[in-house]
Design a protein with these regions (language model features):
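Intrinsically disordered, low-complexity non-transmembrane regions of multi-pass membrane transporters
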Residues: 263-290, 319-338, 569-573
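Hydrophobic core segments of alpha-helical transmembrane domains in multi-pass membrane transport
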Residues: 10-23, 35-46, 72-79, 115, ...
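Transmembrane helix-loop junctions in multi-pass membrane proteins
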Residues: 47-55, 87, 120-121, 161-181, ...
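Hydrophobic transmembrane alpha-helices that form the pore/transport pathway of multi-pass ion
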Residues: 96-98, 102-216, 428, 434-437, ...
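Membrane-embedded alpha-helical segments and adjacent helix-loop junctions characteristic
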Residues: 54-139, 366-470
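Hydrophobic transmembrane alpha-helices of multi-pass solute/ion transporters
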Residues: 1-77, 90, 94, 98, ...
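Alpha-helical transmembrane segments of multi-pass membrane proteins, especially transporters
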Residues: 31-39, 64, 72, 107, ...
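Juxtamembrane and boundary regions of transmembrane helices in multi-pass small-molecule transporters
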Residues: 24, 156-276, 487-573
Length: 573
């Protein structure tokens, strides 16, 4: 394969996805299917991939997506059921009272602390929080933007740690050495103090511009909230603690606790019921807060039980593990490996989510109408997000096994010409062109993948193998570089058309998505740049050369920012 032609063909599906999303405004699932088809055709006709390999690799990708795709399905089921029983509305009423009337405190309690908790248990801030923010007097743009960026601080641990679990599985597969979930989580956690503080401060800027950004108390509590979340993430992912799956849940609870203590010490109210209207008061009377919280309480309890109690964890994750085998393949060094995917079906977060929903049912009114509406709305809401979550995994596996052909025994053979493998070719070109500066690109590639797919998990699936191979070529720390890609994918949440449209639709503000993305783009790019700098510093042993590269990158970006700011300044009359 000609390197230049191959590079263009590899980039083509990604460019097509951008065009479909941005210009034609196609949904993520439609875009994903089109891009997958194009990738398969390119793999077969340009990279000489066996058609059977392409199809089986796609199926393997879909199975590998189960931790996120099935989690999307079960979380939609739980949220729909809670909505039909009134539990969701009762919780939203409680959320409205938080913050004590202080704008910075409301933002950090609801969009940051509560957002962390909700994302952690599989709830959706973009569906639940926009009406709350609007009721508190924030503009429609801010009411959409804040819950969207609320996905960002610790996205790796969202949905009971699904992205971290997928990273563990994918990285173990491409590297040939099994890593533990807590270890993968600890690598991501090292980025979190900086990322979390940046996101907390960005929330103030989005909500109130310079006025809130330079508000002394607001900036102080934003830093407190961000540092608290980051340090909690590090602690939860220590080997002796091993609570990766509950990192977001615990971090959200700790942030809320710290802000509560701050208000107590400052002698300021933590709650304000003045925001409640008659409908809210009726919701309070109809259902108690503790009953409304039961599905989430059960879910957290099950997560603790299956994570901390070793006999139960081992029985569900290992003894009852269901392994799906798709055959064998040969690596570039002629090692033959099994393409087997360990589903850990009964241990996964999606199973716990389903069980928690079922166990909670006796505590709520379950007449025929509630169950019928839950079923009909679930069938309407779930399929497309599930497909969108799964299809990019299929695309990633096709890229990983492009150029492979089966021998007479059925083993997939690595291409005789290595450039017929998309991942190998892309890794070779970029590592040769950028050298030791290559780690700077990982977070931005993740940002791009996260924007296209709407998911950090999909970004991990798409590019982890590529980053591993490129890092090995230049002698960089591959797990740091690959994790940086995941961080970038998480930061894309504030740019995700699907998430932003969801938030806008909840408050009947479809059409403001472009304005939200423009605000979010500034935050996403700045935080991704900070992540890229940390990646470069940590990818190699510290030296004057890497420090020089970091300073050079800062200077270049500062100059570009200064030029743009100067060009946009108002002209004098």
């Amino acid at each position: 394969m000609n390197p230049l032609l191959g590079f263009i063909l590899i980039i083509l599906p990604i460019a097509l996805a951008l065009v479909l999303l941005v210009y034609f405004k196609k949904a993520a699932d439609t875009t994903g299917v089109v891009v997958w088809i194009v990738t398969v055709l390119i793999a077969i006709f340009a990279f000489q991939t066996d058609i059977g390999v392409a199809i089986i690799a796609s199926l393997a990708g879909i199975v590998r997506s189960f931790p996120i795709s099935l989690m999307v399905a079960t979380s939609i089921l739980m949220m729909t059921y809670m909505q039909e029983t009134g539990a969701l509305q009762r919780l939203i009423v409680f959320f409205k009272t938080l913050g004590g009337g202080s704008r910075p405190m409301q933002i950090l309690i609801i969009s940051f602390g509560l957002g962390l908790f909700l994302v952690g248990i599989g709830a959706t801030p973009v569906s639940m929080l926009p009406p709350v923010m609007l009721a508190l007097g924030f503009s429609p743009l801010v009411s959409v933007a804040l819950p969207s960026i609320g996905y960002d601080p610790l996205t790796t641990y969202a949905l009971l740690g699904v992205p971290a679990q997928v990273f563990t599985d994918v990285y173990s597969g491409v590297s040939g050495s099994v890593i533990d979930l807590w270890f993968a989580g600890s690598v991501f956690a090292s980025f979190m103090p900086v990322v979390s503080v940046g996101i907390a401060i960005a929330m103030l800027w989005i909500a109130g511009g310079k006025k809130l950004l330079f508000n002394r108390e607001g900036l102080f509590i934003a830093i407190i909230a961000g540092v608290t979340a980051g340090i909690t993430a590090i602690i939860c992912n220590l080997e002796v603690v091993n609570l990766t799956r509950l990192t977001n849940v615990i971090a959200g609870a700790v942030v809320l606790g710290v802000l509560f203590v701050y208000n107590k010490v400052s002698k300021k109210p933590f709650m304000d019921r003045a925001q409640l209207d008659e409908n809210d008061l009726n919701s309070e009377k109809a259902l108690s807060l503790w009953r409304a919280s039961i599905p989430w309480v059960i879910l957290v309890f099950l997560s603790l039980l299956t994570t901390l109690v070793e006999p139960i964890r081992n029985f569900l994750a290992n003894t009852l593990d269901i392994v799906i085998n798709f055959g064998q393949y040969q690596t570039a060094d002629f090692t033959v490996r099994s393409l087997s995917i360990s589903t850990k079906f009964l241990w996964q977060a999606y199973t716990l989510m389903l069980i928690a929903t079922l166990i909670s049912m006796p505590f709520f009114k379950n007449d025929r109408k509630v169950l019928k509406n839950t079923y009909s709305k679930f069938i309407k809401r779930a399929p497309r997000p599930v497909l969108a979550a799964a299809i990019f995994f299929a695309m990633a596996e096709v890229m990983n096994f492009s150029g492979f052909i089966p021998d007479i025994s059925g083993v997939w053979i690595f291409p005789t010409d290595p450039t017929n493998n998309m991942v190998y070719l892309l890794a070779s070109i970029t590592s040769a062109a950028l050298g030791t500066a290559y780690p700077l690109t990982a977070a931005f590639l993740g940002l791009l993948a996260g924007f296209i797919s709407g998911s950090e998990t999909s970004a991990i699936a798409m590019f982890t193998n590529y980053h591993y191979q490129a890092s090995m070529t230049i002698g960089a720390n591959s797990i740091i570089v690959a994790a940086s890609n995941g961080i970038g994918g998480g930061l894309a949440s504030v740019l995700s058309p699907a998430k932003i449209q969801n938030a806008a639709a909840v408050i009947d503000q479809i059409g403001i998505e472009g304005d939200v993305i423009r605000y979010g783009l500034v935050v996403a790019v700045l935080m991704t740049f900070a992540t890229a700098l940390m990646t470069l510093l940590w990818a190699f042993p510290l030296s004057l050369y890497t420090i020089g590269l970091v300073f050079a990158a800062i200077i270049v970006v500062s100059l570009i920012g200064g030029i743009i700011s100067w060009m946009r300044r108002p002209t004098s009359q």
